[in-house]
C-alpha cells in the first residue's frame, strides 16, 4: 500500500470508546454494533461478546477493556474502519476507562432512559473531556415502560453541559437507533491525524501473557507504521525486540502486513520478560526512534491493601508468577512480599477497591489454580511518631507501639452520591454513621440530588456500597476520589488465641467503636475456630489492655466411664491426671485458624453500627 492509499485509509478510520455507568447497556450496545457491521455472524453471536472473561459473563459486568476492528458501510457509500473499545463502568475500574480513552478520538456516552445521568456517567464523561474527545450522546433503553427520554435529554444538558438535541434515542436490546448512532460516529468523530512518515510512536494500552507467543501488546499507533521484522524499542525500559506479528482483533485475532498511524491492534515480539512491558509505555523503532515518548497514564494509587497467602507455602513462587502475569493485564494491581507469623510467606497487594480485590482473588484461583488465604483489607495510614518522622502503615501488624505514636492521620475520600429526593435522609444517616462530614447538596432537577460528603476511606471499603444500594433500593450511585488525610483517634486491636497474638487478625479501628468491634470479633471467632482438647481463650487487646474475652470450651473425654462408681479415690486420681494432661497440652498446643476467621474481621461492621 503506497503513501496516498494509506492517507485515504487513515481518513476513513474512527476510533471510539463506549462509556457509561454500570448496567446502562454498554456491552449490549457493543453486541448490536458487531451484528450491524457484520463483524460476527448470527450463529457466532452471544450476549456480552466482548466480555471474554468467564468471570465477566458470570457477574454480568465488564472488567477489562476490549478493542475490536469493524467495517461499516455508511450512507455516503464509503466504507469506514471503526475501532471500538468497550470499557468497564464500575468505579473500581475507572483506570481501565482512562486507558481506553487515551487510544480514541471519540466516545459514545450511553445513558439509561429510565435512570438518567448517574455518578459514574459524570466521572467517565469528565475523563473523556480531559482527553478532548468528541462525545456522541446515546439515550439507551427507550423501550422500557419507565423510560423518559426527554427528561434524560434535559439532564444531559443541565448536569453534564453537553448539547443533547442530537442525542440518539436507542434500544440496544431491540436494535433501535443503532444505525443512526453509527452515522453520527462517522460525521462527528474526527479521523486520526498522526503523521504516517514520522518515526514509529505507539501507545501500549493493554497487554496479556501468552504461553506460546510471550507478551502480546495491545497498541494504538499514533505516528508512523510497524510491520513484522521491524526492530522496536520500549522507551520506558529500553528493551529492544524484533516484531514477529502484528494484527487486529475482529473480535478474533487477524494477522496484518502492517499497522499504521490511527490503527488499534496487537503486536507480538517474543517478549518473555514481563518486567519490560508497562501499560502506558511508548513503542518506537529502534533504528529510527521518536524524539520523545507519549504522555502515558496518570498512575493509579491503590486504595485498599490486603495480604494474599498460598495455603501451601511451597506455592509461594507460583503465586509470584501468577501475580506478575496478572499485573500485565491489570496495571492497577501492586504487590510486594511480606511474611506473617501465622500464615508464612505471601504478598501485600494493593487494589483500587473491594470489587477489584475480589476479582483479582477470583482470577488467581480460576486462571492460575491458586488456593489462597486473604487477610481483611486495610488502607494506608500516615503515622507521625514522637520523634517527628512520618511512616506509612498499610498492614495493621506493622503499626508501632502506642507510646511511640504522636498522631495517626487516616485517608479521606470526597464521595459524590446521586440519589432520588425520597432517599436523601437515608443516605445522610448512612454517611453520618460512617463518620462522614457533610460538605454540600445540589438539586439536579425536581427528582434528584447530588450529596457530597467527606468520609474516611476505611469506612467506604467495607460495605458502604452495599449499604448505600440497600438503603436506597438500588437508586443511589456513588463516585469517590481521594481527598488527603485527617488526624483521627485510631487504635490497633490485637487478637490473641491461647495467649498468642495472631498478626494476620490485627486490625485498626476508631476508638469509639473499638470495644464493640473487639467484642463482636471475639464472639464470632468462638463460633468459627474448631474446639480442641484443651480450653482456648480468645482475647481482643489494645496494647496490654484486654477489652474483650471469651473461651472455647474443651472437648471432654469421660475418663471415669470404665471404673466402678463407688471408688472416689480412683475417680479423683483419673480426673487429676486428665487435668494435668490438658494443662501440658495447652502449654504446647497450637490453634489452627480457618480462612473464615480472617474474613470475620471484615463482617463486624454490620453488628456494631
Curated annotation (Swiss-Prot):
What PROSITE patterns would the database entry show?
G_TR_1, G_TR_2
Which biological process annotations from GO are given for this protein?
positive regulation of translation
Which residues of this UniProt protein bind GTP?
A: 23-28, 140-143
Q: What is its main location?
A: membrane
Q: Which domain of life is it from?
A: Bacteria
Q: According to its UniProt record, which reaction does this protein catalyse?
A: GTP + H2O = GDP + phosphate + H(+)
tr-type G domain ranges (all copies): 11-193
What EC class is this? hydrolase
What the record says about family reads: Belongs to the TRAFAC class translation factor GTPase superfamily. Classic translation factor GTPase family. LepA subfamily.
- What function does the entry list? Required for accurate and efficient protein synthesis under certain stress conditions. May act as a fidelity factor of the translation reaction, by catalyzing a one-codon backward translocation of tRNAs on improperly translocated ribosomes. Back-translocation proceeds from a post-translocation (POST) complex to a pre-translocation (PRE) complex, thus giving elongation factor G a second chance to translocate the tRNAs correctly. Binds to ribosomes in a GTP-dependent manner.
State what protein this is by name: Elongation factor 4
Specify the species.
Ligilactobacillus salivarius (strain UCC118)
Amino acid at each position: 500500500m503506497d503513501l496516498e492509499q494509506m492517507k485515504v485509509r487513515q481518513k476513513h478510520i474512527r476510533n471510539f470508546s463506549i462509556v457509561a455507568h454500570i448496567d446502562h447497556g454498554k456491552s449490549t450496545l457493543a453486541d448490536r454494533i458487531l451484528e450491524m457491521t457484520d463483524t460476527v455472524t448470527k450463529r457466532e453471536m452471544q450476549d456480552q461478546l466482548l466480555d471474554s472473561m468467564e468471570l465477566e459473563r458470570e457477574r454480568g459486568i465488564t472488567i477489562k477493556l476490549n478493542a475490536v476492528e469493524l467495517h461499516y458501510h455508511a450512507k455516503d457509500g464509503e466504507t469506514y474502519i471503526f475501532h471500538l473499545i468497550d470499557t468497564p463502568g464500575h468505579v473500581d475500574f475507572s483506570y481501565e476507562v482512562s486507558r481506553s480513552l487515551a487510544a480514541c478520538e471519540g466516545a459514545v456516552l450511553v445513558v439509561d432512559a429510565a435512570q438518567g445521568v448517574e455518578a459514574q456517567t459524570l466521572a467517565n464523561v469528565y475523563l473523556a473531556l480531559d482527553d478532548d474527545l468528541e462525545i456522541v450522546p446515546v439515550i439507551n433503553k427507550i423501550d422500557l415502560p419507565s423510560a423518559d427520554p426527554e427528561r434524560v435529554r434535559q439532564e444531559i444538558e443541565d448536569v453534564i453541559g453537553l448539547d443533547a438535541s442530537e442525542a440518539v434515542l436507542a434500544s440496544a436490546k431491540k436494535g433501535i437507533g443503532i444505525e443512526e448512532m453509527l452515522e453520527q460516529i462517522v460525521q462527528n468523530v474526527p479521523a486520526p491525524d498522526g503523521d504516517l512518515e514520522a518515526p514509529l510512536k505507539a501507545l501500549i494500552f493493554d497487554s496479556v501473557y501468552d504461553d506460546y507467543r510471550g507478551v502480546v501488546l495491545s497498541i494504538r499507533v499514533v505516528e508512523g507504521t510497524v510491520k513484522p521484522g521491524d526492530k522496536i524499542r520500549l522507551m520506558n525500559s529500553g528493551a529492544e525486540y524484533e516484531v514477529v506479528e502484528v494484527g487486529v482483533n475482529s473480535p478474533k485475532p487477524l494477522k496484518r502486513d502492517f499497522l499504521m498511524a490511527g490503527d488499534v491492534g496487537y503486536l507480538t515480539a517474543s517478549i518473555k520478560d514481563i518486567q519490560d512491558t508497562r501499560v502506558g509505555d511508548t513503542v518506537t523503532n529502534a533504528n529510527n526512534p521518536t524524539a520523545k515518548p507519549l504522555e502515558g497514564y496518570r498512575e493509579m494509587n491503590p486504595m485498599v491493601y490486603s495480604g494474599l497467602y498460598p495455603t501451601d507455602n511451597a506455592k509461594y513462587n507460583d503465586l509470584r508468577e501468577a501475580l506478575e502475569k496478572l499485573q500485565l493485564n491489570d496495571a492497577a494491581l501492586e504487590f510486594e512480599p511480606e511474611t506473617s507469623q501465622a500464615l508464612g510467606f505471601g504478598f501485600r497487594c494493593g487494589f483500587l477497591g473491594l470489587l477489584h480485590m475480589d476479582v483479582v482473588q477470583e482470577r488467581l484461583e480460576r486462571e492460575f489454580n491458586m488456593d489462597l488465604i486473604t487477610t481483611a483489607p486495610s488502607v494506608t495510614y500516615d503515622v507521625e511518631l514522637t520523634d517527628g518522622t512520618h511512616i506509612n502503615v498499610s498492614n495493621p501488624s506493622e503499626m508501632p507501639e502506642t507510646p511511640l505514636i504522636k498522631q495517626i492521620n487516616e485517608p479521606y475520600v470526597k464521595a459524590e452520591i446521586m440519589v432520588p429526593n425520597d432517599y436523601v435522609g437515608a443516605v445522610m444517616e448512612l454517611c453520618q454513621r460512617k463518620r462522614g462530614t457533610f460538605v454540600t447538596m445540589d438539586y439536579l432537577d425536581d427528582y434528584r440530588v447530588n450529596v457530597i460528603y467527606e468520609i474516611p476511606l476505611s469506612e467506604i471499603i467495607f460495605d458502604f456500597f452495599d449499604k448505600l444500594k440497600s438503603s436506597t433500593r438500588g437508586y443511589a450511585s456513588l463516585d469517590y476520589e481521594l481527598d488527603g488525610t485527617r488526624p483521627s483517634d485510631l487504635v490497633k486491636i490485637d487478637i490473641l488465641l491461647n495467649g498468642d497474638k495472631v498478626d494476620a487478625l490485627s486490625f485498626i479501628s476508631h476508638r469509639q467503636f473499638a470495644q464493640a468491634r473487639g467484642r463482636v470479633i471475639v464472639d464470632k471467632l468462638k463460633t468459627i475456630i474448631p474446639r480442641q482438647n484443651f480450653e482456648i481463650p480468645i482475647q481482643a487487646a489494645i496494647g496490654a489492655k484486654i477489652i474483650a474475652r471469651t473461651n472455647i470450651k474443651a472437648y471432654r473425654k469421660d475418663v471415669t466411664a470404665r471404673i466402678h462408681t463407688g471408688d472416689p479415690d480412683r475417680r479423683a486420681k483419673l480426673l487429676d491426671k486428665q487435668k494435668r494432661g490438658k494443662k501440658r497440652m495447652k502449654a504446647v498446643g497450637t490453634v489452627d485458624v480457618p480462612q473464615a476467621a480472617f474474613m470475620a474481621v471484615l463482617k463486624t461492621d454490620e453488628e456494631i453500627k
